[in-house]
Amino acid sequence: MLLRLALSVLPIVGSALAQAGGPYVDPDNGITFSGYTDPVHGVTYGFVFPSVASGSQEFIGEIVAPLANQWVGVSPGGAMLNNLLLVAWPNAGKIVRSARYTTSVFSSRSVAMTGPVLTDLPSSKVNSTHWKWVYRCQNCVTWTTSSGPQSIPTNDFGVPAWATSTVAVDTPSDPQSTFLEHTDFGFYGLDFSQAHVSDDQYAIWAAGGTTGSPSPSPTTSTPSSTSSTSSTPTVVATPYDYIVVGGGAGGLIAADRLSEAGKKVLLLERGGPSLGSTGGTYQATWLKGTNFTKFDVPGLFETMFSDGNPFWWCKDVNVFAGCILGGGTAINGGLFWFPTYNDFSSGAGWPASWNNHGPYTAKLKARLPGSDHPSTDGKRYLEQTYDVASKLLNSQGYTNITINDNPDFKDHAYGYSTFDFANGKRAATISTYFQSAVARPNLTYKQYTMVLNVVRNGSQILGVKTNDTSLGPNGVIPLTPKGRVVLSAGSFGTPRILFRSGIGPSDMISLVQNDATAGPNLPPQADWINLPVGYNVSDNPSINLVFTHPSVDAYENWAQVWTNPRPADAAQYIKDQSGVLAQASPKLNFWRAYSSSDKRTRYLQGTVRPGAASVTTVYPYNASQIMTITAYLSTGITSRGRIGIDAALTARPLVNPWFVDPVDKAVLIQGLNDIVSGIQNVPGLTLITPDNTTTITDYVNNYDPGSLNSNHWVGPCSIGIVVDENTLVKGTKNLHIIDASIVPSLPVGNPSGTIMSAAEQAVAKVLALAGGP
């Protein structure tokens, strides 16, 4: 059914389209678009193409936005990096626009894309409430950037990306104006195969003509099996003792230990395989002939953020989150620290019964010892930044240690970066716990299966509802009579499942209630469970300092390792998984404790690596000699945020957790000043971001708030607040959480090791509960 679009009825269109695109007619020009209206910001995105048979390289598009959206961008190819990005904004009653692409997720800078030809069509306009850009985009279906050829899937289903900002661009009259990073972004599904009309009709619209609704042109696409409403035989669902939702660090440990105990376990992962050993196939060209994927090779970590086909990121979470086997541990830098005593102390928010983490960390260490020299030849490579940084730190009284041999020594301590890699490849919980779990006949693993909500009768969980109707009637998978569900979907995924299950604050559950698809699956309002899900959220505020030193090899800033690595290094890695590519970019880590005005002790962690995400300086510099020190504030911070969902049910931060308490900011500024205070003790070391035209304080005060994100989110389902000491969700009889969301405060280092140790302890407590299964 076609939807009639008018500026005054945008909320109606948004409600109708939800998160999947559909056809509508623009009444100003009669063009039939396939599009989507974001219900949060009220922005509509539309596309229409000539016939598939024409093989045309153009389309007509439109953006309709309320004036509150100072600029809007859309990427029909479905990614922000190395993809066509069309950006527009109103200025003096007219539309200013450009075709661009971005090269780094760490910078809001974009560059003009040569090739696309944009023509504004007559129905573009600005009025008192909205602005509308209707355009013809020629040479816009395929393009080539440094990551290779890209294209819009014009005869298939696609996932366009959008971005918007409430902050105006720097120079509104300039189509190539710079601007700050978007204040929000997202994705939606669109069947491009249905977005075509006849060539004659398209030609009329492209010339600025108007007409009524046309007949869509024939396409060669086949119907999607997921949209069929035909009658099918009733599926008989298999009940399980435990259903583990999510194949990240916590979920894989839980599934392994539960199945090891002889329980009948179902492990569900919404994404697909990662490592080659798990069925993953996404390879760089130079890896062809091996079984190594992008996720196996540690040296490809930096390319996770610059790939034109980043299918591993969750499309319904507006921060980086891994929707792939292994979750965040499949795509992060692999830094791996055994927890300190304080990480599980009562002062850090843990129940007293959790204080002795030692036996559980020992179990973790037996399975995953980690290494600060993961290359199979035992050597370390590209260590110039280690040498430079160690001189800087030695001058400030730091001690060089083997970090995981001294986990409680975290003040004025530094050492080689330690990773959860093994045999020169990424390991984490994927090649350890997962491999032993799936080898057991009592564990069933299903990938590409998304859990929407738990099915419950009051406090009793009966099973889970998924998107896979082959697993049970309407996708519902039941528990055995004494069974339990373990949510391990991460700090954004787990809260959303709870909201969709009627568990959490009423404002979040009400958003679910108003959703046409999710609302009917809620329990009766009398059975809603009011818990502070989403509150008490922490993440490390982090700031990058960029230096140059003549001894440093920036390794082409990691820009060539995917498409054109140094030949000798590629050959060495393929031969025996040794060399530069057998470890990720970090080379050194350090910690320092700070007392502060509120009498609390806060810890600063530093990570040193060759290369830099972005450089801001008025002076010339040698890009082949750049290195970065990232300073994070961790244990002891008091700032907290909130995680929730919006009207589209996209998971997102509702309140950012960085610098809510000004004391946190003051301590981080002090730490940065201390780091740079020793520069004169290292001949040749130059700070270029910030350079000498900016003070550290001004640099921090003007730092892009979105760039403070370290993506180390913990706490939205904190133990003692949302779950009890046995990880049981309060108000339920058999729903548990084992993931980062129960961690009540930030550990002193990157959280993966602490999360894994917590998972070992949590699953032991679950198995010890009376009442089974």
What kind of region is each of these model predictions?
Residues 248-249, 380, 384, 492:
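Residue-level detector of alpha-helix initiation sites
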Residues 1-25, 486, 739, 773:
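Fungal secretory targeting signals
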